[in-house]
Amino acid sequence: MASLKDLRNRIASVKATQKITKAMQMVAAAKLRRAQMAAEAARPYAERMDSVLGNIASGVTLSADTPLLLSGTGKDEKHLLLVCTSERGLCGAFNTNIVRAVRERANLLIGQGKDVKFFCVGRKGYDQLRRLYPGQIVELVDLRSVRNLGFVNAHDIAEKIIDRFNKGEFDVCTLFFSHFKSVISQVPTAQQIIPATFEKAEGPSAVYDYEPEESEILADLLPRNVAVQIFRALLENQASFYGSQMSAMDNATRNAGDMIKKQTLIYNRTRQAMITKELIEIISGAEAV
């Protein structure tokens, strides 16, 4: 049975932890508002750029002049999975859910005899994947020193990915991130970014004349589109991280409150039992006299 001192120390420790989780919840809530606004602002641009490029690409006949980012290598043997996770933990199942989606895709591809490699953005995903797939991670991009996430960060990642593609290191690149829906809902999402794939527009499309030629426009814009899609994914991930962290810290704060109540009840009962025992001893001693 724990002593009163042990129980007091335990209660004080949980109260200190509760203060930390409450503070982290408030910080995450403040950062979430900014991150959510950034993610929601990036969505229309990324979707519109994808749509415009899709319209241009629909009128292109694949040939030797077609940009490789659109035509691809013509193979489907080597896959690069671009995995975006967080640099820090204490965010519930945020990273685990993304890695689970990555594992499902990787195991499916490996089962089909494909060569699978990983390009990690964020240390948490890297730490899990390097244990699961040793020797298959080609690069880690660490963003811990980045205070304000900007397009330049996505552009740098895109350049590295495209450079590896041009060197023939992979045939297909799929981007994994967490799509932010709400504070309690973040959906792991997979998006193929190389070679570019576009959804077909519904209904008849207008006919345009382009200057310069479509292939030249695509050659200029497809690399930028890779960066734009990665930037959108990073912003979605950032909002998802803070939403998940806020929920996790809120749950931790509530659990700490429940634990404090439970330990306080045990403390009061133990103290009452000790007082009762002392009274019995005093009365017994008086009767003996």
Swiss-Prot record:
Sequence similarity: Belongs to the ATPase gamma chain family.
PANTHER family: ATP SYNTHASE GAMMA CHAIN (PTHR11693), ATP SYNTHASE SUBUNIT GAMMA, MITOCHONDRIAL (PTHR11693:SF22)
Stated name of the protein: ATP synthase gamma chain
Record membrane topology: Peripheral membrane protein
Main subcellular location of this protein, as a coarse class: membrane
GO biological process, one term: proton motive force-driven plasma membrane ATP synthesis
Pfam families noted in UniProt: ATP-synt
Function: Produces ATP from ADP in the presence of a proton gradient across the membrane. The gamma chain is believed to be important in regulating ATPase activity and the flow of protons through the CF(0) complex.
Matching PROSITE patterns: ATPASE_GAMMA
Signal peptide range: none
Gene Ontology molecular function terms on file: ATP binding; proton-transporting ATP synthase activity, rotational mechanism
Keywords from the named record: ATP synthesis, Cell inner membrane, Cell membrane, CF(1), Hydrogen ion transport, Ion transport, Membrane, Transport
Protein's cellular compartments: Cell inner membrane
Gene Ontology CC annotations of this record: plasma membrane; proton-transporting ATP synthase complex
Oligomer and partners: F-type ATPases have 2 components, CF(1) - the catalytic core - and CF(0) - the membrane proton channel. CF(1) has five subunits: alpha(3), beta(3), gamma(1), delta(1), epsilon(1). CF(0) has three main subunits: a, b and c.
Natural source organism: Azorhizobium caulinodans (strain ATCC 43989 / DSM 5975 / JCM 20966 / LMG 6465 / NBRC 14845 / NCIMB 13405 / ORS 571)
